């Protein structure tokens, strides 16, 4: 079974999970290839929800294509659930997210939800976070300041270029990748994140940081994880 089949399988499992929610509510929807499979699987059941709140421009485009109603987060009081993938997830449900560059939108929508339903394949499960480079979204003016502060954590800091992300965004490959918010992203490699909540708080206090791709405060409540044997449901 290949990676796409695993993503499709867990996307369909997430569809079944959210259809257990009472009808007429607003659903939070994440970003990325696994989230896309979830959106596609849910399309035939969009009438179950009063609308959706999207974590990125790309997700909004896909939801609208399928006929979902997409609401402004500022007009929504709260969400019963937020469904999204992860770049890494540890045994406690802490995650690294932001490989696709939309960590700030994802964290905002996740904070609105009563539960975070994480969907991924088993390759994303790790004993300790840090094998995947940790994304940090910053104000461009602060690149030097934030880079020096991040180096104190012991990792290698690099500025993400447009060529290292999605080609469909039509950004100049040799220029810094620009987020939906106009920010840049610093990727911190070589970390071993034994205390995700502590590191999340410390990095978020650095002047110039918009947010860090550690989801410890907004950790997963439910994990749907696919492997060759099927989909396992883990509650944290």
UniProtKB/Swiss-Prot annotation:
GO MF, one example: ribose-5-phosphate isomerase activity
Record GO biological process: D-ribose metabolic process; pentose-phosphate shunt, non-oxidative branch
Binding sites annotated in the UniProt record for substrate: 31-34, 84-87, 97-100, 124
Gene3D superfamilies: 3.30.70.260, 3.40.50.1360
Catalytic activity, reaction form: aldehydo-D-ribose 5-phosphate = D-ribulose 5-phosphate
EC nos: 5.3.1.6
UniProt KW Transmembrane helix keyword: no
Annotated active site: 106 (proton acceptor)
Coiled-coil portions: none
Pathway entry: Carbohydrate degradation; pentose phosphate pathway; D-ribose 5-phosphate from D-ribulose 5-phosphate (non-oxidative stage): step 1/1
GO cellular component, one term: cytosol
Protein keywords: Isomerase
Family from the record: Belongs to the ribose 5-phosphate isomerase family.
Protein name: Ribose-5-phosphate isomerase A
